[in-house]
């Protein structure tokens, strides 16, 4: 997982939102876990998301859908 990869978020309310990882994985000081920064195209916001959640196949609401080269 690295900058440029595409993330999809599917909330319980339906729909899907696409985000682009803007920073490679690193320790996020607030969470004290490995996280990536994501730019969400629908509203122009940035969030940090835990890498372990994105890669967990049981967490279907947030997933890596395309890896950049």
Language-model region placement:
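A short, compositionally biased
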Residues: 2-3, 30-35
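Glycine-centered tight beta-turn/hairpin loop motif at sheet-sheet or coil-to-beta transitions
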Residues: 12-14, 43
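Hydrophobic aliphatic residue packing
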Residues: 7, 21, 34-38
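Short linear proline/tyrosine/threonine-rich motifs used for host-factor recruitment
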Residues: 7, 18, 48-50
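Short beta-strand-centered aromatic/proline hotspots
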Residues: 15-28
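Short coil-to-beta transition motif at edge beta-strands of beta-rich domains
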Residues: 1-12, 20
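Intrinsically disordered, low-complexity, charged/polar segments
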Residues: 33, 38-69
């Amino acid at each position: 997982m690295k900058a440029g990869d595409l993330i999809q978020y599917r909330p319980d309310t339906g729909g899907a939102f696409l985000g682009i990882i803007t920073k490679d994985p690193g320790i996020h000081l607030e969470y004290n876990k490995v996280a990536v920064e994501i730019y969400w195209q629908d509203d122009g916001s940035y969030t940090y998301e835990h890498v372990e959640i994105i890669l967990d196949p049981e967490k279907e609401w947030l997933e890596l859908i395309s890896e950049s080269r």
